Amino acid sequence: MSITIRKLDSTSAGFGAELRALLAFEASEDAAIEQSVAQILADVKSRGDAAVLEYTNRFDRLSASSIAALELPQDALQTALDSLAPKARAALEAAAARVRAYHEKQKIECGTHSWQYTESDGTVLGQKVTPLDRVGLYVPGGKAAYPSSVLMNAIPARVAGVGEIVMVVPTPDGVKNDLVLAAALLGGVDRVFTIGGAQAVGALAYGTATVPAVDKICGPGNAYVASAKRRVFGTVGIDMIAGPSEILVLCDGTTDPNWVAMDLFSQAEHDELAQSILLCPDGAFLERVEKAIDELLPSMPRQDVIRASLEGRGALIKVRDMAEACRIANDIAPEHLEISALEPQQWGQQIRHAGAIFLGRYTSESLGDYCAGPNHVLPTSRTARFSSPLGVYDFIKRSSLIEVSAEGAQTLGEIASELAYGEGLQAHAKSAEFRMKH
C-alpha cells in the first residue's frame, strides 16, 4: 500500500500558512500524569528512600529490600562490558573515543577557561570557570535502551570536570541492559542506581539517605520523566525538555533517492510524532524519493511507526532553488539538518539555525547519532533558534571576579554612589562612599 505524504510547493499562495501548520506542535500535558508526578515528587521529598523504594518495586515489578540494594558496583559495569560480543564492544569503545575526542576539542575552543585582566589603577576583573559538583544522568530502561545517549550525556560532563556523575536507569522485572551498563563504564559514570521514573528524578533533585542530590539532571525519558524534570527545574538545572525528533533534508536532486528516503525513515522510526521533511528544487526528484519510500517501507521492521510519522507530520516540499531551501530551513530551525548536495559547504554557510548540520551526501544523520563525535542531544521544536546541542559548556558555570584596588575604589565609588542615590538605595551608596578618601 503506497504512502500518502504531504506535498507542498513554495510558489503556492498559501505556502506560508501550510508550512506553519506542518510545523505546529504543542506537547500535550496529561492532567493525570501531572497529578501523579506531583504526588510522587512530594512523596520522595518527604519520605526519601522509602518512597523511592516503594514506587520502584511497584512500577518495575521488583522486590528490592533497600535502595542500597539497587546500586550497581563498578565491577558490575565491567562485567557488562566484558560480556559484550567483540564487535559490539569495539563499536561502543570506538564511539566513546570519538565522542570524547570531540568534546576535549570543544573544551579548548569554547571558552571553558578562567581569565582576568588588570586595569591601570590595579583593579583586577575577570571570570572564574568551574565545573558542576555533581550531575544526574537519566537513562531510559526496558525496550527503549540507548547506550549512545549514555555516552553523549556522560562524556561531556566528565570532560568538563564534573566531580561526580550519578546515573539512574530503571530495570523492569530486574532486566539489565549490558550495552547501557558498559556505556556507563566507558562514559565515566561514578554511581549507577537501577531506579527510574519520576521517583528517580525526585531522588536526584532532592537527595535521599542513599541517592545524593545533584546540581543538574540530563537525559531523555517518557512523559512522567519529562514532567518531573519540568517540576524540579529551579531546585536543579536540567538539560532540556525535548520534543519529537526531527530531520530536514535539503537536496539538490543529485543524491540517490534511496539514500534520502532512508534518511527520512531514520527519524520517522522514532515515533509517530517525529517529523521528516525534504526540500528540493527538482520536482522529478521528489517523485523519485516518493517512489523509493513506497518501495523501501515494506522492508522496515518499524514500518507502521514510519508510515504514521510520514503521513501525519512528514512532507515533500518543492522550492524555487537551494537558496530558498536554506531560507526555509532557517525558519524551521530543525534538530537535524542534512545538506545533501554537490556543494554542501556553500549552502551550509547560509544556515544559521539548526541543532546539527550534516554536510554532503555521505553524511547520514545516523552517523551523528552514534559515532561521529558531536553530541546527539539537540534542540527540537524550533528551539535551535536560541539554544545549542548539549556540550561541555552545559556542565560548567562562570563566576565574575572583581578585586578593586584602593585607587579604583575612589573612581568606581563615585560612579556607584551617584547611581545608587538615583535609585534610592542609600546603603548601596554609603557602602561605596565609606571606602573613598574624602
From Swiss-Prot:
CDD domains reported in the protein's UniProt record: Histidinol_dh
Active-site residues from the entry: 335-336
Binding residues annotated for Zn(2+), in chain numbering: 267, 270, 369, 428
Organism domain of life: Bacteria
Binding site for NAD(+): 138, 199, 222
Catalytic reactions of this protein: L-histidinol + 2 NAD(+) + H2O = L-histidine + 2 NADH + 3 H(+)
Top enzyme class: oxidoreductase
InterPro entries from the UniProt entry: Ald_DH/histidinol_DH, Histidinol_DH_CS, Histidinol_DH_monofunct, Hstdl_DH
Record bears the keyword Transferase: no
Amino acids binding substrate: 245, 267, 270, 336, 369, 423, 428
Any one GO BP annotation for this protein: L-histidine biosynthetic process
Keywords associated with the record: Amino-acid biosynthesis, Histidine biosynthesis, Metal-binding, NAD, Oxidoreductase, Zinc
Record bears the keyword RNA-binding: no
EC numbers on record: 1.1.1.23
Gene3D superfamilies: 1.20.5.1300, Nitrogenase molybdenum iron protein domain
Cofactor binding note from Swiss-Prot or TrEMBL: Binds 1 zinc ion per subunit.
Annotated Gene Ontology cellular component terms: cytosol
Family: Belongs to the histidinol dehydrogenase family.
NCBIfam families to which the protein is assigned, alphabetical: hisD
Protein name in UniProt: Histidinol dehydrogenase
Species in which this protein is naturally found: Burkholderia lata (strain ATCC 17760 / DSM 23089 / LMG 22485 / NCIMB 9086 / R18194 / 383)
